[in-house]
Amino acid sequence: MTRIAINGFGRIGRNVLRALLERDSDLDVVAVNDLTEPATLARLLAYDTTSGRLGRPVTVEGNVLVVDGRRITVTAEREPANLPWAELGVDIVLEATGRFTSAKAARAHLDAGAKKVLVSAPADGADITLAFGVNTDAYDPDLHTIVSNASCTTNALAPLAKVLDDLAGIEHGFMTTVHAYTQEQNLQDGPHRDPRRARAAAVNIVPTTTGAAKAIGLVLPNLDGKLSGDSIRVPVPVGSIVELNTTVARDVTRDEVLDAYRAAAQGPLAGVLEYSEDPLVSSDITGNPASSIFDSELTRVDGRHIKVVAWYDNEWGFSNRVIDTLQLLAAR
């Protein structure tokens, strides 16, 4: 078994543990570090507004979470370098606080005794950025110790971009994600570094920024600098959609585009990219573990100009890719 510690037991940290409980995996979560008291962490794991009840027993014994018989040590340490990873025999740390998102900051987990770190966000200076299934082959265990899993949107965009680039060569493009609100926004109007995100998340359409288009160049280097994009946050708690508008190097037909995505979803990107012919809305894809659910009905083609669209559960889909990436790091 590979011993995993989760630093930060928020939306992604809890969803990763939930998803792991549904898998037959050799990943063993042995520790959680979060500044919240264990009883509150247990309650938030057991009851979730978006995902529903866990359906497995969760109890607390002192500083230990007992989840369906699994014992998980809980610590509340602000500084990663002071965490007891050596003492607990931790192999890989999942850095999920959203705070230690640089290689320099994440390296503190190595100083504390972990062998590798997976950052569940874009990470400046990471040894490699992986969108599982898209550039997995680029991982080298001898070179890559601090790994970034990019973002939920990058993981949704990467399969869209790869298939289209392989088919006809993307020359340039623009992406827009219509994204569920997140905890980083305000529930009511209040101070925020982004004046739009300062406004009440549950009652506003909030135009803002995304780093997904820039990060795609880390996953698919031949697309570096070719894509740009924006984000629009909308009043739903989960379930997002990304639209990619591109100009490609040659004329293609709509059937060619659809055939390419269908083949990828059934072949090399199976489990990461899903192909749908149904008239979906966001609630239909809640709980879907794919990174990217291609909506074939929304495909538009005019010669070299192509628009493709994919849905994604920005929590559950991404959490499943985190697990896939942890398994990759554990195996190699």
UniProtKB/Swiss-Prot annotation:
Active site: C152 (nucleophile)
Annotated keywords: Cytoplasm, Glycolysis, NAD, Nucleotide-binding, Oxidoreductase
Enzymatic reactions: D-glyceraldehyde 3-phosphate + phosphate + NAD(+) = (2R)-3-phospho-glyceroyl phosphate + NADH + H(+)
GO MF term list: glyceraldehyde-3-phosphate dehydrogenase (NAD+) (phosphorylating) activity; NAD binding; NADP binding
Enzyme class: oxidoreductase
CDD domains assigned to the protein according to its UniProt record, in alphabetical order: GAPDH_I_C, GAPDH_I_N
Family matches, as SMART domains: Gp_dh_N (SM00846)
Function: Catalyzes the oxidative phosphorylation of glyceraldehyde 3-phosphate (G3P) to 1,3-bisphosphoglycerate (BPG) using the cofactor NAD. The first reaction step involves the formation of a hemiacetal intermediate between G3P and a cysteine residue, and this hemiacetal intermediate is then oxidized to a thioester, with concomitant reduction of NAD to NADH. The reduced NADH is then exchanged with the second NAD, and the thioester is attacked by a nucleophilic inorganic phosphate to produce BPG.
Name assigned to this protein: Glyceraldehyde-3-phosphate dehydrogenase
Annotated organism of origin: Kitasatospora aureofaciens (Streptomyces aureofaciens)
